[in-house]
Amino acid sequence: MSRRRRFKGRDVHGILLLDKPTGLTSNDVLQKVKRIYNAAKAGHTGALDPLATGMLPICLGEATKFSQYLLEADKRYEVTAKLGERTNTSDSDGEVVSTRPVNVALGTLIESLDQFRGPIMQVPSMYSALKHNGRPLYEYAREGIEIEREARPITVFELKLISFEGDEVKLEVHCSKGTYIRSLVDDLGEVLGCGAHVTQLRRTQVATYPYERMLTLEQLECIFEQAKAESIPPREQLDPLLLPMDTAVAALPEVNMLAAVAAYVNQGQAVQVAGAPQSGQVRMTVGPEREFIGVGEIDDEGRVAPKRLVRYHDEHDEE
């Protein structure tokens, strides 16, 4: 019996800034983008809740090797919270577990926000993807099991009050990796004494990626269908929308080297490069074209040692 040939998709590399719609999981939209691009490999860079919208960088091909740098990057959010109701998920997708009157003055709210600025400790929500004994916490939560969680250090660089009307508060948050906005709102509600939960959440920035470069699923699907209708290979319209994969590591200092030196790096060898930093990770480029070949790390001898290298396949792409 012959085995059916597995379809692998095509070799495409880059980062798409997707404007995630509400109501879908991050994996839902990842699979849709992967299918539209017919990509062999794809991964996202930090899940957004189904309720949330906004920037979700999707890494395709070799760009997936550098997704961790975006996971660790700062984020910006716009969040709307409803005071007076606390839910089991800390957002409007959950069940209301307590209702309290809202007697919050503007001055009290402004003063309370001070407690959540700067380096703080935060206890993650039970409805999160953090793992306990190999299982995400939300699975335990759905079974009614409460797992003790340790508070984790996070940093809230900015916390701006946008508006406060009735029982609705709108905030803008600039925070470090690992920050749960739902937990932030839930904690704020407890400090105010009335409870609170998230009703709208939008991620507006990851690292330094520009807001205006985001694309919706509808836009991608429209581009794909229009290309097919005009007998144009969809890749010709879709691939230019991708950002270069090295934008994921743009914060790292660049080390530019000659092609002859890069040949040793591509074989896994550490090399001496004039002008390299004394320590830390670096973004490695080659020649005057500054072709990105991966991320290196300065070893104990001051050499640039390869850490993650870009590898392109030689075979022809599959449509």
From Swiss-Prot:
E.C. no: 5.4.99.25
Pfam families: TruB-C_2, TruB_C_2, TruB_N
Active site: 49 (nucleophile)
CDD domains membership: PseudoU_synth_EcTruB, PUA_TruB_bacterial
BP GO annotations: mRNA pseudouridine synthesis; tRNA pseudouridine synthesis
UniProt keyword terms in alphabetical order: Isomerase, tRNA processing
Keyword tRNA processing attributed: yes
Entries under SUPFAM superfamilies matching the protein: Pseudouridine synthase, PUA domain-like
InterPro entries (alphabetical): PsdUridine_synth_cat_dom_sf, PsdUridine_synth_N, PUA-like_sf, PUA_sf, tRNA_psdUridine_synth_TruB, tRNA_sdUridine_synth_fam1_C, TruB_C
Catalytic reaction(s) noted: uridine(55) in tRNA = pseudouridine(55) in tRNA
Similarity comment: family membership: Belongs to the pseudouridine synthase TruB family. Type 1 subfamily.
Protein role: Responsible for synthesis of pseudouridine from uracil-55 in the psi GC loop of transfer RNAs.
Protein name: tRNA pseudouridine synthase B
Species for this entry: Aeromonas salmonicida (strain A449)
